[in-house]
Amino acid sequence: MDPKSQRVKLNDGHFIPVLGFGTYAPEEVPKSEALEATKFAIEVGFRHVDSAHLYQNEEQVGQAIRSKIADGTVKREDIFYTSKLWCNSLQPELVRPALEKSLQNLQLDYVDLYIIHSPVSLKPGNKFVPKDESGKLIFDSVDLCHTWEALEKCKDAGLTKSIGVSNFNHKQLEKILNKPGLKYKPVCNQVECHPYLNQSKLLEFCKSHDIVLVAYAALGAQLLSEWVNSNNPVLLEDPVLCAIAKKHKQTPALVALRYQVQRGVVVLAKSFNKKRIKENMQVFDFELTPEDMKAIDGLNRNIRYYDFQKGIGHPEYPFSEEY
């Protein structure tokens, strides 16, 4: 199966590859690793690269993409690149400058997809995570519909081909969809999604509105990040997942990725380990049976690794809703 043809049509007519390469790494990981890993990912066949202003590696990721264009491995139009608008720039007048900053770091003319990283707006300024003396996040108050209108203008200006959201619940999506004078629907909602949090209701909602669900933390999460709730079980050690993997002579990670592909979810695979980057491309080489899919569906326990507890109390905190 040719991974290049593994694409899903977005509601604006553009196509997104169903397997994406995630570039987030904890701060202690040298940024040069993002450069090498992204280059290698493109070499082994990844055509969808996901990053964000928050990750502070767009310079390296852009360099990787440009070097693979320069050496003839790919053309710019072969690559689907996603960037994200961070929470401190949700005020409408800050949206375009934030995207232009990302483009400047990337040294690219446009991104393929620009998404609102989270609905929780934070105080504008040069701090990613503005906190008061007691260590509490300093919230901002923004109408997400106004933020959305600013994204629509970025699309019209050709700075991004498509626009979407991330970490939105269905009510927040509805708010955008029902906005008077809506010009473009969100093409996607990128959320945490894996067998322990399979997002079946949100997936159904998104499908009914022709919005693609993009899965991050598809393999669970490294329990070291400050954003992660570390009391959770390790997904890839799940006995059901391991048994299905053994049956197919695949790894539990590949089974977790394949599960999403078969549900019509676009899935991000995040690893800077060359062996695993290459291995993740094998997601197209096997198929899970309906019984396998049902068994994995049965693992759902609404466990959220990235629960962003510091955002609780914000009027737009997304995870108080069931979906």
Curated annotation (Swiss-Prot):
<feature type="binding site">
    <location>
        <position position="117"/>
    </location>
    <ligand>
        <name>substrate</name>
    </ligand>
</feature>
<feature type="binding site">
    <location>
        <begin position="216"/>
        <end position="221"/>
    </location>
    <ligand>
        <name>NADP(+)</name>
    </ligand>
</feature>
<keyword id="KW-0521">NADP</keyword>
<protein>
    <recommendedName>
        <fullName>Prostaglandin F synthase 1</fullName>
        <ecNumber>1.1.1.188</ecNumber>
    </recommendedName>
</protein>
<comment type="pathway">
    <text>Lipid metabolism; prostaglandin biosynthesis.</text>
</comment>
<dbReference type="GO" id="GO:0005829">
    <property type="term" value="C:cytosol"/>
</dbReference>
<dbReference type="GO" id="GO:0008202">
    <property type="term" value="P:steroid metabolic process"/>
</dbReference>
<feature type="binding site">
    <location>
        <position position="190"/>
    </location>
    <ligand>
        <name>NADP(+)</name>
    </ligand>
</feature>
<feature type="binding site">
    <location>
        <begin position="270"/>
        <end position="280"/>
    </location>
    <ligand>
        <name>NADP(+)</name>
    </ligand>
</feature>
<keyword id="KW-0443">Lipid metabolism</keyword>
<dbReference type="GO" id="GO:0004032">
    <property type="term" value="F:aldose reductase (NADPH) activity"/>
</dbReference>
<keyword id="KW-0643">Prostaglandin biosynthesis</keyword>
<dbReference type="InterPro" id="IPR023210">
    <property type="entry name" value="NADP_OxRdtase_dom"/>
</dbReference>
<dbReference type="InterPro" id="IPR018170">
    <property type="entry name" value="Aldo/ket_reductase_CS"/>
</dbReference>
<feature type="binding site">
    <location>
        <begin position="166"/>
        <end position="167"/>
    </location>
    <ligand>
        <name>NADP(+)</name>
    </ligand>
</feature>
<dbReference type="GO" id="GO:0016229">
    <property type="term" value="F:steroid dehydrogenase activity"/>
</dbReference>
<feature type="site" description="Lowers pKa of active site Tyr">
    <location>
        <position position="84"/>
    </location>
</feature>
<feature type="binding site">
    <location>
        <begin position="20"/>
        <end position="24"/>
    </location>
    <ligand>
        <name>NADP(+)</name>
    </ligand>
</feature>
<keyword id="KW-0644">Prostaglandin metabolism</keyword>
<dbReference type="InterPro" id="IPR020471">
    <property type="entry name" value="AKR"/>
</dbReference>
<keyword id="KW-0275">Fatty acid biosynthesis</keyword>
<keyword id="KW-0560">Oxidoreductase</keyword>
<keyword id="KW-0276">Fatty acid metabolism</keyword>
<dbReference type="Pfam" id="PF00248">
    <property type="entry name" value="Aldo_ket_red"/>
</dbReference>
<dbReference type="InterPro" id="IPR044482">
    <property type="entry name" value="AKR1C"/>
</dbReference>
<feature type="active site" description="Proton donor">
    <location>
        <position position="55"/>
    </location>
</feature>
<comment type="similarity">
    <text>Belongs to the aldo/keto reductase family.</text>
</comment>
<keyword id="KW-0963">Cytoplasm</keyword>
<comment type="subunit">
    <text>Monomer.</text>
</comment>
<feature type="binding site">
    <location>
        <position position="50"/>
    </location>
    <ligand>
        <name>NADP(+)</name>
    </ligand>
</feature>
<dbReference type="GO" id="GO:0001516">
    <property type="term" value="P:prostaglandin biosynthetic process"/>
</dbReference>
<dbReference type="GO" id="GO:0047086">
    <property type="term" value="F:ketosteroid monooxygenase activity"/>
</dbReference>
<keyword id="KW-0444">Lipid biosynthesis</keyword>
<comment type="function">
    <text>Catalyzes the reduction of PGD(2) and PGH(2) to PGF(2 alpha) and a stereoisomer, respectively. It has a broad substrate specificity and also reduces other carbonyl compounds.</text>
</comment>
<dbReference type="GO" id="GO:0047017">
    <property type="term" value="F:prostaglandin F synthase activity"/>
</dbReference>
<dbReference type="InterPro" id="IPR036812">
    <property type="entry name" value="NADP_OxRdtase_dom_sf"/>
</dbReference>
